[in-house]
Amino acid sequence: MGLSTLEQKLTEMLSAPVEALGFELVGIEFIRARQSTLRIYIDSENGINVDDCADVSHQVSAVLDVEEPITVAYNLEVSSPGLDRPMFTAEHYTRFLGDEVSLVLRMAVQNRRKWQGIIKSVDGEMITVAVEGKDEVFALSNIQKANLVPHF
């Protein structure tokens, strides 16, 4: 997925501190708005609880206070990826081969920006998704947002 320069910088800066606490840094979203939000998704083999989020929030806040990579006021949110897990990297798509994903593209493909289908394959920076019985190929750099589709 095409991360912004700031999101890439934050991912590089915060991966080690999050991993030092025993968690995987799943991804980072920075939402610019009147009140901006820095959202950090973490995970572990044992799942995530509120105390885990608080520990990571404390550690990340300390790093951000020193490095000051964000120049505007923002709220910091730390959470688990949830059932509709966001997808950020080629590795995420590989991990969830065969699962259903919802995509929002930066640039339309076949006059569509929204797609939903089964993840079939990952080849470098390209993914193949089976949509209504037809394989569609998307560049990760063209994916603005991607989430797993939970089934109950």
UniProtKB/Swiss-Prot annotation:
| GO annotation, cellular component aspect | cytosol
Tell me the organism: Serratia proteamaculans (strain 568)
Task: Say which family it is in.
Answer: Belongs to the RimP family.
UniProt protein name: Ribosome maturation factor RimP
Kindly indicate whether the keyword Cytoplasm belongs to this entry.
Answer: yes
Q: GO terms for biological process?
A: ribosomal small subunit assembly; translation
Location of the protein in the cell: Cytoplasm
Keywords for the protein's UniProt record, in alphabetical order: Cytoplasm, Ribosome biogenesis
Function, as annotated, reads:
Required for maturation of 30S ribosomal subunits.
